[in-house]
C-alpha cells in the first residue's frame, strides 16, 4: 500500500492512497509504481476502446450493455512473449487462445472495432493457429496455450478448422488490409481443405465433437461445424475476388458452398418436438440451442419453425436459451448466436423482445454486468469472448453488416417497430 497510514481530514479535504499488486519472475525486483500515471494510463486505454463502434438506440439499457461488452472484450488483451493476445480471462484463462473464443467469436468483432491492440491480437491468434498446419492434414489443436508455446487438444477435432476458417475470413474482409489478408490466406485455405476432406457420404462435415467438448452429445457430424464451414466458403469466395485470385478458385468455393448448404438442409432438417427445425446430429430428437446457427449464416429455409422453437418454453429460460430442452444448463454463446440470427432473419420485434430481457438480466442482475460463459459450470464466469458476441448481435444482426470485400459490404438494418431511429457510429472497418 502506497501513502498508507493514519490521515486526519478536515471537511472538504481528501487523501489518496494506492493498493498495488505485482507479480514478477524469480530473481526480478518489484517495479517502482506511480499510481497517478497508472490511473491515467487506464483511463486512456478505456477511452481508446470506447471511442469507436458506438451504439445509439432509444433503449438506454441496450446502449449501456453494449458499452460494457465493448470494454470487456477490448480490455481482455494481454502482452505475451509472442505478442498481444485476446484471452477469455474471467479469473481463469490467460495467455492462451481457443478456436471458438478467439478465432470464431472475437476475431470478426475486432475487424469492426477499430481498436489497434484488438486488431493485433486477432492477427496474432490466427498466426498462432497457423503454426500447426501440416502436410498430413492432422487437425489444428483446439487451443494454443502458455503464451503460444504449447497446445491443448483433449476433445479431438471439435470442428476447429471450420471455426478458424469462418473467423479468419470474416476478420480479413472486415479489417480491409490486403497484406494482412494475404498472410491469413494460407490458414484459411488449409482449414477449408481440411473440412472438405471430412465430408461424409451424406455431404456434411464429420468431427469428433463440438465446442461443448462432449458435455452434450454431438454425434459424428453436427450442425455447427457444417454451418460454419458453409459460411467460411462464402467469405472465402469474397476474399478470393477481393484479392484477385483466379476466377476458377472463387467459383470452386461458391460451388462447394452451394453443395454444403443443400446438404445441411437435407441432412439436419427435421421435425423435432413438433417444430420444423433442425436436429443437431442424426440421432438427435430433443431440441438443442444450436439449431439457431443456420440463421446466423444466411440459411433461412426453416427459419419459422426454428425461431418458434428457440423462443418456446422448451428452450427459452430466464437466462436465455437452454443448451438442451428440459435441462438447466445454459451457455450464453448460443443465446447470443440465436439473437443475432433472429435479427438477421428479419424477425426484428421478436428478437428485440428477448434481447431486451436478456440484456436487462445481465446488466442489472445479481452477477457481473456482462454476458457470461455458462451455468452451472464455472458459475457464470465473465469470459471476454461472449462480450464480443454480444456486440456482434447489433453489428451483424440488428444492422445486418456483412463484409463482401476489402472496401465493400452488404447492410440490412432491422429497425424495430417501436423505434424511430437507431445508429451504429464510428465503425472502423474496411481499412
Predicted regions and their residues:
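Gly/Pro-rich turn-and-neighbor structural signature
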Residues: 55-68, 250-272
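Substrate-binding cleft and catalytic face of glycoside hydrolase catalytic domains
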Residues: 169, 189, 198
Amino acid at each position: 500500500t502506497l501513502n498508507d497510514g493514519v490521515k486526519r481530514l478536515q471537511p472538504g479535504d481528501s487523501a489518496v492512497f494506492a493498493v498495488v499488486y505485482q507479480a514478477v519472475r524469480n530473481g526480478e525486483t518489484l517495479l517502482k509504481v506511480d499510481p497517478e500515471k497508472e490511473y491515467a494510463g487506464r483511463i486512456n486505454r478505456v477511452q481508446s476502446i470506447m471511442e469507436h463502434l458506438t451504439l445509439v438506440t432509444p433503449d438506454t439499457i441496450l446502449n449501456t450493455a453494449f458499452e460494457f461488452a465493448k470494454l470487456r472484450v477490448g480490455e481482455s488483451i494481454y502482452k505475451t512473449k509472442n505478442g498481444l493476445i485476446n484471452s477469455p480471462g474471467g479469473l481463469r484463462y490467460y495467455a492462451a487462445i481457443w478456436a471458438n473464443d478467439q478465432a470464431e467469436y472475437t476475431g470478426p468483432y475486432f475487424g469492426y472495432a477499430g481498436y489497434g491492440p484488438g486488431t493485433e491480437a486477432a492477427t496474432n491468434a490466427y498466426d498462432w493457429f497457423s503454426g500447426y498446419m501440416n502436410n498430413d492434414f492432422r487437425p489444428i489443436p483446439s487451443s494454443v496455450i502458455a503464451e503460444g508455446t504449447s497446445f491443448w487438444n483433449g476433445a479431438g477435432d471439435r470442428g476447429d478448422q471450420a471455426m478458424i476458417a469462418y473467423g479468419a475470413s470474416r476478420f480479413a474482409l472486415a479489417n480491409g488490409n490486403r497484406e494482412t489478408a494475404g498472410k491469413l490466406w494460407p490458414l484459411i485455405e488449409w482449414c477449408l481443405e481440411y473440412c472438405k476432406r471430412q465430408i461424409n457420404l451424406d455431404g456434411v462435415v464429420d468431427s469428433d465433437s463440438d465446442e461443448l467438448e462432449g458435455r452434450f452429445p454431438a454425434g459424428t457430424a453436427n450442425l455447427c461445424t457444417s454451418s460454419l464451414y458453409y459460411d467460411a466458403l462464402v467469405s472465402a469466395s469474397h476474399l478470393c475476388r477481393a484479392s484477385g485470385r483466379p476466377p476458377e478458385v472463387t467459383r470452386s468455393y461458391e460451388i462447394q458452398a452451394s453443395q454444403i448448404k443443400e446438404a445441411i438442409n437435407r441432412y439436419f432438417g427435421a421435425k423435432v418436438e413438433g417444430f420444423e427445425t433442425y436436429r443437431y446430429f442424426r440421432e438427435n430428437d430433443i431440441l438443442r440451442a444450436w439449431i439457431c446457427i443456420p440463421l446466423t449464416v444466411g440459411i433461412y429455409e426453416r427459419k419459422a419453425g426454428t425461431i418458434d422453437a428457440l423462443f418456446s418454453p422448451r428452450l427459452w429460460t430466464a437466462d436465455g436459451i437452454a443448451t438442451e430442452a428440459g435441462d438447466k444448463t445454459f451457455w450464453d454463446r448460443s443465446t447470443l448466436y440465436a439473437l443475432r440470427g433472429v435479427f438477421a432473419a428479419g424477425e426484428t420485434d421478436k428478437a428485440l423482445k428477448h434481447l431486451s430481457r436478456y440484456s436487462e438480466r445481465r446488466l442489472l442482475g445479481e452477477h457481473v454486468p456482462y454476458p457470461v460463459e455458462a451455468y452451472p459450470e464455472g458459475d457464470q464466469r465473465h469470459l471476454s469472448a461472449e462480450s464480443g458476441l454480444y456486440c456482434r448481435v447489433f453489428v451483424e444482426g440488428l444492422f445486418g453488416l456483412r463484409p463482401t470485400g476489402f472496401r465493400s459490404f452488404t447492410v440490412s438494418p432491422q429497425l424495430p417497430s417501436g423505434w424511430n431511429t437507431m445508429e451504429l457510429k464510428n465503425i472502423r472497418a474496411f481499412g
